[in-house]
Amino acid sequence: MLNHRYHHYFHRHHHLNHHLYHRHHHHRHHHHRHHHRHQILHQNRHQIHQILLSLNNKIMGYAIFLFLSILLHLVYLVIHRL
């Protein structure tokens, strides 16, 4: 559930950045050759975004796992102390 909300936030944030980026660079888009290069860049950015998302999910999963293991360890220590 946490992961989903985080994912949604990340996606929204990325889109906001994308919008700002496009608005900022819009007045230079007169050359057709440049536009083609931008299209390639856009495709690359999409691929990078996908890689980042999968990496992000792995990191989140690992972080949750780490957090749970620490929590279990703490609980174990508390029980042992009693």
From Swiss-Prot:
Protein name, UniProt field: Histidine-rich protein
UniProt keywords, alphabetically: Malaria
Miscellaneous note of the record: This protein is coded on the reverse strand of an aspartic acid-rich protein.
Organism from which the protein derives: Plasmodium falciparum (isolate fcm17 / Senegal)
